[in-house]
Structures are given as C-alpha cells and as structure tokens.
C-alpha cells in the first residue's frame, strides 16, 4: 500500500491547494463556505477532474474529498451534512472503466461524464462516517505520517463493505478543511489481492494493526485458485521462529 500512501499525499496536497486558491480568490475564510452553495459548487467543479485522475492512477475502488462545510446550515440534520465528492469505479479496474458519483453535485458529475450512483446523495453524512470527529482533530504531523486505515464498515445505502484510506485536508495556515482518501471495497480486495500461492487454502487480511489483527474489522481474500475461510476474531501475532510470525 505504499502507492496508496504516495497518491494519498498527492491527493491531499492537490485538494487543499484548490481550497486555498478559491478562498484567496473570493477573499473568504474557510468558515464562510457554510451556506455558500455557489462557492462549494465551484470547488467541486475544480476538484472532480484531479480526483478522477488520481482514482484511475491508483489501485483502489473509489476516491473522495470531504469538506467540513455544508450548503445549508438550516436544513434538518445539517450538523452531520458535509459537502464534497465521492467517486467510484463501476467495474473491473481498467484505464477506461466508467466512474460513478456516490456523493457530490450531480450536475458537476454529469458535466465530467461521471454519472450518479444508484444510491447518490449530494452530501456526506458524518454520523455514518467512521470516527469522523476523531479524524477531524487538528494535528501537526506531516502528511506522510498522517494517513490511516479505517475499520471495515458498510457503505451507507449499499451492501458493500469497505475500508477507507484517510488523510487530512489542511490549509496553508493549518486550518482543517476536511478529509480525503481512497476506498478499498471488499469485492475489489477479493478480486485484486487474491494471491497466486501454491497453497490450496490461504487467508489474506487487510486489517488495522495493534496488539493483534482485528479480523472482524478487516477485508479478506484468498488464493487465485483455491478457497479460504475469513476469520472474524482478533488474531494474536506470535513468533514461529526463523523470522516468521
């Protein structure tokens, strides 16, 4: 996942720069993006092409940028509603695979040949976003030390299980603009990370690591020619000797 880290840092820098430029152009503070649908729409218009380009260049199933602002602070549920873009690959990971808009302005998406997802909504719901408040806590660590992998969760409105590779969006002055990163779906991981091993049965996990591997919060795959059993408990790491764990 070194590529994800590099591309994630590039994505964060690109998206933060777009926000910085738009705020400077309009002489606004970031807080003034709330209740400014015209400005938020202009930002999405500028962000969608570089976001789609990064998605096509990266081994993942989706890419997103979430801004900590909403088009209407007076609507019901506005405290959890956030603007941004979330784009997914609609099929096999090929250079020309069509892209779908899961979150963001439908008009902006259509103008760039990104059609709305069947579960499209205009804005993110942060109460359905894993540990949103935690990831939005300002930090000073450089971007290459600031990425993280969420636990597996069900993408709202779908039956797809995903993990998100997250990075912060920070302004030149350190203001937290939001989050960005990449999606790795369960189906994508199974298809693209099955191992060409000589074993009949092999389990591969993408899991948050701590004292052990939280298998119940992980994505899993097997071998290209066999089958596997996906564990659902926390796995404890033990040395087997000879440099093996």
What is the predicted function of each stretch?
Residues 3-137:
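Extracytoplasmic/periplasmic sensory segments of membrane signal-transduction proteins
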Residues 64, 163, 180-181, 204-206:
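Structural recognition of the beta-strand scaffold that forms the well-ordered cores
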Residues 186-245:
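Intrinsic low-complexity, intrinsically disordered coil/linker regions enriched in small/polar
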Residues 67, 155, 171, 207-209:
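Acidic surface patches and DE-rich sequence motifs
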Residues 104-181:
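Extracytoplasmic/periplasmic ligand-binding sensor regions of membrane-associated signaling proteins
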Residues 70-72, 155-156, 184-188:
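Solvent-exposed loop/turn segments at secondary-structure junctions
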Residues 75-77, 159, 217:
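A short acidic (Asp/Glu
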């Amino acid at each position: 996942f070194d590529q994800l880290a590099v591309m994630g840092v590039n994505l964060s820098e690109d998206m933060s720069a777009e926000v910085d430029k738009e705020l400077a152009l309009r002489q606004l503070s970031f807080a003034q993006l709330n209740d400014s649908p015209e400005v938020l729409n202009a930002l999405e218009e500028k962000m969608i092409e570089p976001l789609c380009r990064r998605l096509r260049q990266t081994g993942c199933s989706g890419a997103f940028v979430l801004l900590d602002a909403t088009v209407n602070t007076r609507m019901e549920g506005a405290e959890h509603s956030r603007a941004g873009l979330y784009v997914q690959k609609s099929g096999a990971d090929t250079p020309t695979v069509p892209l779908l808009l899961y979150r963001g302005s439908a008009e902006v998406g259509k103008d760039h040949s990104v059609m709305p997802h069947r579960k499209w909504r205009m804005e993110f719901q942060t109460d359905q976003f894993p540990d949103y408040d935690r990831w939005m806590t300002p930090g000073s660590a450089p971007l290459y030390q600031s990425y993280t992998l969420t636990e597996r969760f069900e993408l709202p409105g779908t039956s797809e299980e995903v993990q998100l590779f997250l990075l912060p969006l920070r302004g030149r002055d350190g203001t937290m603009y939001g989050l960005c990163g990449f999606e790795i779906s369960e189906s994508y991981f199974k298809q693209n990370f099955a191992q060409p091993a000589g074993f009949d049965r092999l389990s591969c996990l993408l899991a948050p690591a701590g004292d052990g591997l939280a298998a119940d919060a992980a994505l899993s795959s097997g071998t290209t020619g066999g089958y596997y059993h996906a564990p659902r408990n926390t796995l404890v790491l033990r040395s087997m000797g000879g440099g093996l764990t």
